[in-house]
Amino acid sequence: MAQLIIPPGALGGIDALSAATRMGLESVEHRIVKPPVAWAGTEAETLCDLAGLRAPMAFFHGTAREAAARFPLNANVALVVALAGLGPDRSRVTLVADPASAVNRHEITATGAFGSMVLRFENAPLRDDPKSSAMTALSLVRLIENAGASLVI
């Protein structure tokens, strides 16, 4: 049987979000906050003055599908959350440029019959690619290690 394995990338807790779907999810919201430099070269430049920001600016509110399509290098991780949760059209995403942020932050809130969960990750951006973080690469390393491991956590 063929199997497509989607790594969690910069995030953790995706297994818990996926498990929560077994009882039914009501909402999944993913807020992605990055320094303005991480949004350079994207549509965000036409939605706000990235260089002139003095306070956090939420420049996008929409579905995970829309976020990933419009900001593929920054919000592709929103699809991971969506696929683990409510799907790309029911998962809500907010994208924020924050001049005071030195990290790429992901805040995921989910509610449902299981209760609620709040997941927050603050990943140091890669020096050569501020849109991404080392956690993304480490996630892939762990996936490869798990393929040959007798104990997988």
Regions found by a protein language model. Give the residues of each.
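Active-site-lining helix/loop region of Rossmann-like oxidoreductase modules
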Residues: 4-5, 10-153
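Conserved PLP-enzyme active-site core in the AAT-like
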Residues: 1
